[in-house]
Amino acid sequence: VKSYTVVANKNIKIAKNIGNIISTNFYRTEYSNDVKGVEFSSAIKNIYSMIIVSGQGNNTSSALFRKSVEEMEYLIKFFKGKKETVYGLAGIGDLYVSAVGGRNSKMGEYLGKGFTFKQAKKKFMREDTIEGADLAFEIAPYVFKKISNKKVPLMIALLKAIIKNNKLKINY
C-alpha cells in the first residue's frame, strides 16, 4: 500500500529537496509552493467531510462533495491560496480520504441521522477527537463575521450545528 503526502514551501526547490529525502517506494510526495492553500485545505477538509457524509446516501453525498469542493475553492482564494490546490492531493485527495472513513465522517453520519453534535459526541464518540468540530469552534466567529452565507452555505450550516448544538440543516 502506498501513501502520498504534499510538501509545501514558498520555495519549490526546498519542497522538492525535502520530498526527495522522505520519499520511499511506499511513501510518495507531491510538491507545492502554495503554503496557505495546502494548510487551509488540510484543515477545512475535516469540516467538509462531515458535511458530505451527512447526506445519508451516495447520490446526495456526491452532490454535497461537489458543492464542498466549490466552497473550498472559494475559501482558498479568499485566504490568498491558489485554487488549483483544491484539486490536488491536499484538497480533494485529502477530502476523499476523510469522507470515506475516520472520526469526522462518523460524526457527519450521526449529524445526518438527526443527532446534535453534543448528543453524538456523548453517546457514540465520547473519547474521540473530532478535528472538524475543534476547527469549527476556532473559526466560527471569523467565518460568521467575514464570509457571506451565500458563498459557503454548507460551511455555515455545519458551523451552526456544532457551535449552537442544533440539528444539522443543509438547504442544498
Model feature map: region roles:
Residues 1-2, 154:
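Short, surface-exposed connector motifs at secondary-structure boundaries
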Residues 2-85:
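Internal alpha-helical scaffold of NAD(P)-dependent oxidoreductase catalytic cores
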Residues 35, 45, 52-53, 77-172:
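NAD(P)-dependent Rossmann-like dehydrogenase/reductase catalytic/cofactor-binding core
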